[in-house]
Regions:
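Conserved NB-ARC/NACHT P-loop NTPase core of NLR-like innate immune receptors
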Residues: 1-179
Length: 179
């Protein structure tokens, strides 16, 4: 296993917004880094100690940010990947972006890759002014392929007749292309 870089990743899920607090998300990143080994003893110890606390508060956001900053300075390269950032609550998204900015400033080798719908672009730029934006737009063919895959994997194929299937395959790609 290479020790000269690390990749940590998070997936934000609309249905798990309550569990996906900034503290929990950054804690998950710290756990990923600690589990790879080669992490300073003070970070591993503080992390283990917080896990032992029963009924205690465990690590708090400022503690996690400090530990992440100290930990990433030991890595020449770190890639932080967060998918579906728009699925985060606005409060947690702001906190997460603010914390990420503080964390990556501690290391010249840290890079952040975020995905999300366009409506959060301004929030990202607020915290990462030099961020590159790469818009992704599915083609009509992508939409049709996805629909076919989903319709073909339907567990009850008799619930839909050929006419309804044809309408779905025609109308949904049209409506999406109008967006």
């Amino acid at each position: 296993m290479r020790k000269d870089f690390a990749v940590v990743g998070l997936y934000c899920d609309f249905h798990s917004q309550q569990e996906q607090s900034t503290t929990n998300m950054l804690g998950a990143m710290l756990k990923q880094l600690v589990s790879r080994g080669g992490i300073p003893e003070y970070t591993r110890k503080a992390f283990r100690d917080s896990q032992k606390e029963f009924g205690g508060q465990g690590l708090q956001l400022p503690d996690i940010v400090v530990m992440l900053k100290k930990t990433i300075t030991t890595l020449p390269r770190l890639f932080i990947c967060i998918d579906a950032l728009d699925e985060c609550t606005p409060k947690h998204r702001q906190e997460l972006l603010r914390s990420l900015r503080e964390i990556v400033r501690a290391s010249l080798g840290a890079r952040v890759f975020l995905t999300g719908r366009p409506h959060i672009d301004n929030e990202i730029v607020k915290f990462f002014s030099g961020a590159l934006r790469i818009p992704l737009c599915p083609t009509s063919e992508d939409i049709r392929d996805y629909l076919e895959m989903r319709l073909d994997s339907d567990t009850d194929p008799h619930a839909m007749d050929d006419e309804l299937r044809a309408d779905i395959m025609r109308i949904i790609p049209e409506k999406i292309s109008e967006m």
